[in-house]
Amino acid sequence: MNPFRAAILLSSFIILHSSFAAEPPKVTVSNLRRVFHNGEHNAFTDLCRFRGQLYLTFRSCPDGHMVHPTSSVIILRSSDEGANWKQVHRFSVKERDTRDPHFLVFNDRLFVYTGTWWSGATTLPRADYDLNKHLGYAVFSDDGKKWSEPAMLEGTFGHYIWRAAAFGGKAYLCGRRKPGFEIGPKGEGSKVQSLMLESDDGLIWRKRAYFNETNGDETAFLFEPDGRLLAIGRHGGGKEAFLIRSKPPYTEWDRRQLDRPIGGPLVVKWGDHVIVGGRKTTKGKGSKTSLYWLVGDQLQEFAEFPSGGDNSYPGFIELSPTRALVSYYSSHETDEAGNPITAIYMAELTLKQ
């Protein structure tokens, strides 16, 4: 056989073997617990580590899931690896619904980003939702104790911002918008575009690239050390989620559909393995929050958490090479009167040796 051809075949075998044959580790789930409930609707979680402390954020609203000016973002901190949590900040934006908060550690500063629907002085009727009035905001802290006032994110008007990531001295956001900011109904669904937004300081943003020109929705980014990008995107049409890959300079994108929908997607690396999380729909049990190993282009489920109804949007933080925490929200429990509550939950993951 030609030596050059043999080298190509060997290289292809190694790539395929590493992508598809490596078995992910076994995981045990323990210490499942409710960590926050204040009588309000609590949802959309994220976790991070900053200056030796753990941080948990989520939206809280006395009026429920939909678009209300009464919503706010809560930030909790733990100094004991998640055993106990203390509120360190809570913020809102006048006449806007703050939701989907996400962390980013960037330039030695902790940011919390939120996409905000314009609501006005009262609850906004669903028929009046307008993606073109969306605007991103952030609060930030240099020490996790003292926080800025909410800062409007330049370049995000008309964009529904979502998860953030950083690589190579730049910050990146998923932003979705209507093509040409067209005037019309709400703007969610098959026509919506997903963009990679880029920033030098975490506050002023510009378009870097489109990665979904149709069916754009919530998308999570994961950068490899060499700049390669892996992303998991919710399908704006409610169908199977997207597995998206690119590499610098992010001008070409490989997009393929997974075998299931994923609501509120998460993608993180734990050691040498990639975890995907979010909401799934089951037959007979409704929606559930689950975690998967990504093996090649396939998902292998390893955990389904106690959850139901309005739920998902997990966060993840590694505690050690064999231990991690997962946060999520759910409405599967009830209060003393038998009414459903929507609360924040946490679980510990341990890799089996």
Residue positions per predicted region:
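Beta-rich carbohydrate-recognition and catalytic domains
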Residues: A22-E40, R49-R96, L104-G309, L319-Q353
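Hydrophobic, well-ordered secondary-structure elements that form the walls
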Residues: F316
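Short, basic, low-complexity termini and linkers enriched in Ser/Thr/Gly/Pro
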Residues: N2, I8-F20
